[in-house]
Amino acid sequence: MNIRRTTALLAAVALASSLAGCASESPAAEGSTTTIEFGLPTNMGANNSPMAVAEAMGYFAEEGLEVDIVVTGDSTSIVQGIDSGSLDIGSTPPEPILQAMTKGSDLQLVYNYIRKQTGSLAVLADSPIQSLDDFRGAVIGQASLGTSNMLLSEGILASAGLTPDVDYSHLAVGTGAAALQALKGGQVDALSLWDTEYAAFEAQGTPLRYFTTDEVASLFSTTYFTSAEYAADNAATIEGFGRAMAKATLFTATNPEAALRIMYDEYPDTLVAGNSIDDQLAIDLVALERRIELLTAGDPQASGTWGAYDESALKAWATFALDAGIIDSAVDAVAAAPGTFVEAYNDFDGDAVISEAKDWSAAE
């Protein structure tokens, strides 16, 4: 497989030393290949299946790109990797990006990937927690203590006047079966994860109840970002990457089962030991179909807005982050997302991609 995955549960300093010199400096010349070091905070799974599609269907290759996925395990390391130059493009919700901007990082949001919010707090259906006020004294399970979802949960609970480490605490529990067991076993009172994780838990027979605020529910989620310097020097590379991901997302939305089967082939370790492919598919389809609703909100194919940010949504994020105490000073999120590459992202034959998805078979 051409996507080379590196698991890096290290800080950006370690990333810089291990990957220094790998980052591309300019678009690939005719007939050559540009390598992108791409930071991903979570392991490959249904939520990231469009990445596998972009590789397997040749969408990256068509753009002269090879993508190295660097799995960091948290969002903070990705921001630090972009700052250090050890990563070219990163994937994370906006919270840690906005935090870094207040500390002087010159970052640019380049592709609005998940167009609606994925994160919320979740409890078991029979939990005594009935409102945000009831989280006083709670232990909240996080994928890690460097995840953007921890910041989001703190923002949600701030609306009820609750303060972390005073009124409630966090505990790293991972994701998947480990997180679910921590919740069911009483190690934590709630989880702060995301849509596909929750959908998989419910598909396996664990009903949940969710807590958020109207303000948070209206925000977009995962975004692709880079340094302002990389964006200025590598426009063609960013355009190609975004166009490939737009195609892959459209393919996935058209035929989610094909996207998952492609992912299983490209990443065999996404199959849970003891599960048949059909059993795994039944769980992952529920999760992916929930994610597709967020990936395609506003019908970006019809509107030609793959990767685009709405100015009001950017302002809403900056306001929420400041009001919730995620950042301690105002940032200009609109200026950080100039939309320079959106026209190029949408410059492809959508009908051809849809046909390709509908016609896909496992024999390909």
Labelled PLM ranges:
Residues 23-25:
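Bacterial signal peptide processing site
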Residues 234-328:
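Secondary-structure end/capping motifs
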Residues 45, 72-76, 91, 147-151, ...:
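Soluble non-cytosolic domains of exported or imported proteins
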Residues 28-174, 182-185, 189-195, 211-212, ...:
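Short, glycine-/small- and polar/acidic-enriched structural segments
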Residues 1-10:
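Bacterial N-terminal signal peptides that target proteins for export
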Residues 17-21:
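C-terminal motif of bacterial Sec signal peptides marking the signal peptidase cleavage site
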Residues 178-277:
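Pocket-lining segment of extracytoplasmic ligand-binding domains
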